[in-house]
Amino acid sequence: MKTVSIIGGTGYTGSELLRLLSNHDEVEVVNVTSRKEAGKNLTDYHPQVRNLSNYNDLKFQNIAPEDIDSDIVFCATPHGASMAIVPTLHEKGINVIDLSGDYRFEDIDMYESWYGLKHSGKIDSAVYGLPELHREKIKKSKTIANPGCYPTGAILSMAPLVANDLVEDRIIFDSKSGVSGAGVEASQTTHFANVNENIGPYKITKHRHSPEIGKELQYLANKNLKVSFTPHLLPVTRGILTTAHSFLKEDISPIDVIEIYEEFYKDEFFIRIFEEGMPSLTGVRGTNFCDIGGFEIDQYGRIVVVSAIDNLVKGASGQAIQNMNIIMGFDEKEGLGVGGLKP
């Protein structure tokens, strides 16, 4: 049994890690850190995991990175905080999956420009942890930068077309997310009275996930692409629905496109291709699946692809566990093989 520590255990991603890891047969959580809640019973703060695994016996700890001695560490801290923690764990040879944006960019200037932070802990060997694109690199790395939630749904929705050079260099993503994507801290934006019965775009051209989507698709295309991304906030708790648009370079049918997607993702358990019907948020809620469908082409050659993920699972904690499974040589589905909560 391998041991796991969670640094930053009071947020939504920490909560989801606990829920999902309670079903994992190969690991045991031994440390959950929180400076604010240190000394308090874990299950008093997270009653939803009471009586699961060994959680009734755990208390939050305020433990320094250099004092952590477990096989795997999930770093579920805010952007900017991880870079002060991960290098220490890296030097100790501990397997680290970082859920912040601190290690998603090889280009530090790009990170600093979009996040408005000075990066202080560069690790050249860190790998972008999107298994469907980088599985072999993930296997060989001990430091994984878990992808952002919006980029996960966006990249996976268009990767087969981009990799096969079937679309023009302009791609537009329109994504709609539940409010849990904004984190556990309350704000005016996520206040019930402002979100309920409402929908609205935000950071319409300047969301920090834009360059993350762009760099990964450019990696696949091996050329520059013009990627546009606009997020919207939905009055729901979980899920991201992404609608991707581009123009085909050649005259192919929706059936051809579906075959291309099925071939590209043929070995990917967590990718479900919809030949008919449409992906939905309820279909993926609570799961590590990314559902992809739509595949419609209009009279101008515009192709539209739709993807759905749970932003807290495939968009965060579930994908982090998938990455851990790959690093440790576990069954990739371990702890993650559940269906959607529908209705």
From Swiss-Prot:
What reaction(s) does this enzyme catalyze? N-acetyl-L-glutamate 5-semialdehyde + phosphate + NADP(+) = N-acetyl-L-glutamyl 5-phosphate + NADPH + H(+)
Q: Does the keyword Cytoplasm apply?
A: yes
- Would you kindly state one Gene Ontology biological process term found in this protein's UniProt entry? L-arginine biosynthetic process
Where is the catalytic site?
Answer: 149
Instruction: List the InterPro entries.
Output: AGPR_AS, AGPR_type-1, NAD(P)-bd_dom_sf, NAGSA_dehydrogenase, Semialdehyde_DH_NAD-bd
Ordered alphabetically, the record's keywords are: Amino-acid biosynthesis, Arginine biosynthesis, Cytoplasm, NADP, Oxidoreductase
Query: Which Enzyme Commission number(s) are listed?
Result: 1.2.1.38
Gene Ontology MF: a single term: NADP+ binding
Answer whether the UniProt record assigns the keyword Glycoprotein to this protein: no
The superkingdom listed in its UniProt entry is: Archaea
Main subcellular localisation? cytoplasm
> What's in the GO CC field?
cytoplasm
Recorded hits in CDD domains, A to Z, give:
AGPR_1_C (cd23934), AGPR_1_N (cd17895)
Specify the pathway.
Amino-acid biosynthesis; L-arginine biosynthesis; N(2)-acetyl-L-ornithine from L-glutamate: step 3/4
| Localization, UniProt | Cytoplasm
Instruction: State what this protein does.
Output: Catalyzes the NADPH-dependent reduction of N-acetyl-5-glutamyl phosphate to yield N-acetyl-L-glutamate 5-semialdehyde.
The similarity annotation says:
Belongs to the NAGSA dehydrogenase family. Type 1 subfamily.
Name recorded for this polypeptide: N-acetyl-gamma-glutamyl-phosphate reductase
Q: Which gene is transcribed and translated to give this protein?
A: argC
